[in-house]
């Protein structure tokens, strides 16, 4: 018979081996489980948990946002980070949009009355923590809706007259 110390050591080794084996098998099982991917309608692309679509039929800012609202939780796109800005830019460029600025969900419902241009917000009420103005918006221009500018590669924002008719990008749930 084995001495008591050897038996205790072997028991711990066996227990450790079984625990390691169960962890490794558990990791393998996790890899076999299919991951859920969002499925976007034809003509739109997924980024994060949203679908994005560029519409080349020009509309005013208000009509464009209403058109986006026909989709689940849809609005004109809110651009919340540099990586999202790059994604939206690539979406627009890949469409062949050849020369117009593009509406996004940025607007100033105070019509320039908020001090220091503080009235700008996203149409879907997302918090504005990311700013990428091409030039600071003017409170006297009469332009209270936001676009992505062609000159910036569709990365930077500029104010525009809301009744101008432009292509637009919608952001919505799949």
UniProtKB/Swiss-Prot annotation:
GO terms for molecular function: hormone activity; metal ion binding; oligosaccharide binding; peptidoglycan binding; signaling receptor activity. SMART domains: CLECT. The keyword Protein transport does not apply. Expressed in injured skeletal muscles and sciatic nerve (at protein level). Expressed in the pancreas. Expression increases during the acute phase of pancreatitis. It is found in: Secreted; Cytoplasm. The lineage of its organism: Eukaryota, Metazoa, Chordata, Craniata, Vertebrata. Residues 47-171 form the C-type lectin domain. GO terms for cellular component: extracellular space; secretory granule. Keywords: Acute phase, Antimicrobial, Cytoplasm, Disulfide bond, Inflammatory response, Lectin, Metal-binding, Secreted, Signal, Zinc. PANTHER family: MANNOSE, PHOSPHOLIPASE, LECTIN RECEPTOR RELATED (PTHR22803). Residues 1-26 form the signal peptide. PROSITE patterns: C_TYPE_LECTIN_2. GO terms for biological process: acute-phase response; antimicrobial humoral immune response mediated by antimicrobial peptide; defense response to Gram-negative bacterium; defense response to Gram-positive bacterium; MyD88-dependent toll-like receptor signaling pathway; negative regulation of inflammatory response; negative regulation of inflammatory response to wounding; negative regulation of keratinocyte differentiation. Bactericidal C-type lectin which acts exclusively against Gram-positive bacteria and mediates bacterial killing by binding to surface-exposed carbohydrate moieties of peptidoglycan. Restricts bacterial colonization of the intestinal epithelial surface and consequently limits activation of adaptive immune responses by the microbiota. Acts as a hormone in response to different stimuli like anti-inflammatory signals, such as IL17A, or gut microbiome. Is secreted by different cell types to activate its receptor EXTL3 and induce cell specific signaling pathways. Induced by IL17A in keratinocytes, regulates keratinocyte proliferation and differentiation after skin injury. In parallel, inhibits skin inflammation through the inhibition of inflammatory cytokines such as IL6 and TNF. Induced by IL22 in lung epithelial cells, inhibits cytokine production and regulates allergic airway inflammation. The EPN motif is essential for recognition of the peptidoglycan carbohydrate backbone and for efficient bacterial killing with Glu-114 playing a key role in peptidoglycan binding and bactericidal activity. InterPro entries: C-type_lectin-like, C-type_lectin-like/link_sf, C-type_lectin/snaclec_domain, CTDL_fold. The keyword Repeat does not apply. Zn(2+) binds at residues 107, 121, 144. Residues 27-37 form a propeptide. Proteolytic processing by trypsin removes an inhibitory N-terminal propeptide and is essential for peptidoglycan binding and antibacterial activity. Residues 103-118 are annotated as: Sufficient to activate EXTL3. This is Regenerating islet-derived protein 3-gamma. It comes from Rattus norvegicus (Rat). Induction: Up-regulated in injured skeletal muscles and peripheral nerve. Disulfide bonds join 40-51, 68-170, 145-162. A motif (EPN) lies at residues 114-116.
